[in-house]
Amino acid sequence: MNISIVAIGKLKEKYLKQGIDEYIKRLSAYAKVDIIELPDEKAPENLSDQDMKIVKDKEGERILSKISPDAHVIALAIEGKMKSSEELADNMDRLATYGKSKATFVIGGSLGLSDAVLKRADEKLSFSRMTFPHQLMRLILLEQVYRAFRINRGEPYHK
């Protein structure tokens, strides 16, 4: 399976990079993982609703340009469906079973995702009703994808 993570914003924190690199290495036994970092849109200090929409739309255009037409797109969004690790594993297994060899996870910037990106998404996934820093979400997502592969293979993984 080919897994892409399209994310807004450049990762700056060394500890996050190290964790992400570790999970990409672990996942290499199960899938090819590609992280596509896109620049965040510069925004004025006090954003109006219209300014927020413009920023999200510009970031959304960048995101959509990186999504393969045949990819199954999973947008990380607070309004998405919350799943257990086992449910995510089932979801990943179904994708592989039904011939979807490309899964693209999308992580928006600090303002979230544009309507166009949410519309393109085949599903919306939420990790919590809480908001997490978008840079940290990359690491959390990779850990859960790794856990999903381990579950699907019946391999041990700590709970």
From Swiss-Prot:
Record EC number: 2.1.1.177
Reaction catalysis annotation: pseudouridine(1915) in 23S rRNA + S-adenosyl-L-methionine = N(3)-methylpseudouridine(1915) in 23S rRNA + S-adenosyl-L-homocysteine + H(+)
Question: Mind naming one GO cellular-component term on file for this protein?
Answer: cytoplasm
- Please provide the record's keywords in A-Z order: Cytoplasm, Methyltransferase, rRNA processing, S-adenosyl-L-methionine, Transferase
Q: Does the keyword Cytoplasm apply?
A: yes
What GO MF annotations does this protein's record show?
A: rRNA (pseudouridine-N3-)-methyltransferase activity
The task this protein performs is described as: Specifically methylates the pseudouridine at position 1915 (m3Psi1915) in 23S rRNA.
Q: How does it assemble?
A: Homodimer.
For this chain, the family text in UniProt reads: Belongs to the RNA methyltransferase RlmH family.
The identity of this protein, by name, is Ribosomal RNA large subunit methyltransferase H
Upper lineage = Bacteria, Bacillati, Bacillota, Bacilli, Bacillales
